[in-house]
Every structure is written in C-alpha cells, then in structure tokens.
C-alpha cells in the first residue's frame, strides 16, 4: 500500500520510523518548511525530514495549501493512504480526500478527550491517572474523526509531560504500524466519537508558569510536572525568583499561609500550600544557571523560614 507521510517533530519521526521498520511503502514525505533554529539562527531540518533524507524518500515542504498546488502534487503521488502525525497545520478537506483509503492521524490522547493542542501536557496538568493515544480517520472538524485504534497507559504520579511525551511517542508509533496493517487487510473497525464527551485543550504559554500556592499539593505537583520541559513552573520565595522542576509531597500540616517557607535545608524547600498542607521543592533553576537540587541552590541563595 502506497503511503504518503506527513509530520514534523520527533513525535512524528518515531511514527515514520515505525512504518519504515515494518516494511511499509512510504513513497513520499511532507513536512514543514525549514526554520532557523539555535543561537546562529541557521536553517535546520525537521526530525521527519532528516529521517526521510537518510532513507532516500522524496520530501515536499509546501509553504501554503490555499492555492491547491499541494493538493495537485499529492494527486500525482497517488497515495493509497495518507498518514498525518503532528504536521503542525490544518489541512484542507480536498487534500485529505485524495488518498484511496483516506487519511489517518495519530493523536496524543484518548479521543474524544483532549482534542486540539498539547493533549499530553493537559493530561498531566489536570492530574489524570491515565491517558493514551488514538488513531483516527481525519474529518473536517478538529480531531473529530472516527477512532480506529486506541491504547491506554497510566500516568506516573511524578511523571513529567516530557517523560510522558516520550512514552506516548513510542506507543503511538507502535499503534500506527499495527493499524496500517489492519487497513491493508480490511479488518479495521471505525468507531464514531461521542460528541457529548468531547473536551478541548489550548496551547501552553509562559503566563501559565507561576505557581499558585493556594492550590493543593497535588495540584501544584501536577502544575510543575505538566509544564516540564516547557514553559516550566516558576515561583518567588524570600525575594528570589526561580524555575521549579521537581517537588515531592510531605506529611506535614501547617498553619502558615500558602506560599510561606516552612523550612529550607538539605531536604529542599518546604512551602505551605492550600488546605494547611505543604510540599517540598527538590529541583530548581535560577536565572542564567543550570538545573540543580534545591539543596545546592540554597548554598548560594539561603532562605529563611517564615515560621
């Protein structure tokens, strides 16, 4: 079955690699145009383009899909299946309708939950116990197509969005390869999504970073984990602002107001939270410095307990 693959970041690269390792006939790849990256702002390939070039697969990078040229190009490639994974752009229906067996997409949630951007991060931010990946047929509405495969996984209590991203990247790639085989054999089953259960997410931004110490310890831990590796949780304690990469629960109860320092030492920085509880900050990063343990940070930035 002739497959045209569309994707850009490393999440998509692993899916492309899985198809190639499974022996699928990927005849062409579409990826976003090269963009300047790094301090020197040099143009660099996307992970998907790099893999395609390594394997000798033709790569196309249309700047626009509005003029119909990309759709005509796809028709000349005559794909039987279009696979889209984190391409990074909404595609016109005429483009999605070209492939004989349709267009499918890998999404980082158990649809219809968390349609849209950053589903992996929001699963962590919201404190979900489980999440997963879905393979869907692409529809006109965002992430609203029939689901043809899904796989669930537990979220670790202190698992970061970055760590979960890496796991779902692999899980999604494996599920995609299995699903493509089923499409080829005609054994795939389409399950319409229940619109009543649909939820939507939004992009993350730096305005979300500050920790709200009025929240419960678990909500704050999930805030820290969900914003790691970007945009990263931040706070200001004892007049010092820093990024927070790690924290742990304590059994302590406190009468101090949320955001007050209970203790600061070798174990970390214990801070009062909502509900008379607390948590301990264990890993931080000061401006212009490397990530370090809270204990190491305190050597250069000693803090006084408020109670």
Residue ranges and their predicted role:
Residues 1-40:
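N-terminal Rossmann-like dinucleotide-binding module
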Residues 7, 29, 52, 82, ...:
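A residue-level signal for conserved active-site and pocket-lining positions in enzyme catalytic cores
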Residues 22, 32, 81-200, 207:
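Donor/substrate-binding cores of folate-linked one-carbon enzymes
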Residues 25, 56-58, 102:
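Conserved beta-strand segments of alpha/beta enzyme cores
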Residues 32, 36-78:
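N-terminal glycine-/serine-/threonine-rich beta1-alpha1-beta2 phosphate-ribose binding loop
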Residues 202-215:
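Acyl-group handling in specialized metabolite and lipid biosynthesis
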Residues 214-307:
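An anion-binding loop in the catalytic cleft
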């Amino acid at each position: 079955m002739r497959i045209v693959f569309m994707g850009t970041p490393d999440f998509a690269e692993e899916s492309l690699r899985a198809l190639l390792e499974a022996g699928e006939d990927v005849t062409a790849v579409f990826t976003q145009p090269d963009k300047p990256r790094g301090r020197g702002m040099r143009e660099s390939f996307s992970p998907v383009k790099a893999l395609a070039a390594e394997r000798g697969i033709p790569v196309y990078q249309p700047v626009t899909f509005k003029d119909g040229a990309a759709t005509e190009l796809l028709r000349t490639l005559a794909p039987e299946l279009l696979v889209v994974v984190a391409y990074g752009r909404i595609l016109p229906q005429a483009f999605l309708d070209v492939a004989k067996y349709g267009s499918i997409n890998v999404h980082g949630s158990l649809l219809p939950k968390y349609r849209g951007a950053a589903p992996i991060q929001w699963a962590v931010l919201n404190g979900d116990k489980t999440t997963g990946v879905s393979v869907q047929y692409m529809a006109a509405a965002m992430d609203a197509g029939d689901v043809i495969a899904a796989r669930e996984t537990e979220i670790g209590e202190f698992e970061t969005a970055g760590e979960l991203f890496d796991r779902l990247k692999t899980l999604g790639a494996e599920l995609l390869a299995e699903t493509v085989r089923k499409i080829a054999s005609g054994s795939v089953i389409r399950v319409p999504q229940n619109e009543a259960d649909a939820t939507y997410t939004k992009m993350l931004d730096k305005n979300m970073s500050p920790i709200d110490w009025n929240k419960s310890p678990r909500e704050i831990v999930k805030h820290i984990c969900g914003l790691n590796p970007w945009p990263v949780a931040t706070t200001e304690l004892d007049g010092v602002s820093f990024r927070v990469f790690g924290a742990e629960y304590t059994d302590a109860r406190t009468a101090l107001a949320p955001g007050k320092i209970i203790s600061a030492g070798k174990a970390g920085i214990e801070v009062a939270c909502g509900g008379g509880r607390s948590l301990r900050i264990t890993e931080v990063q000061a401006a212009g410095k490397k990530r370090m343990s809270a204990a190491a940070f305190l050597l250069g930035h000693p803090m006084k307990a408020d109670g």
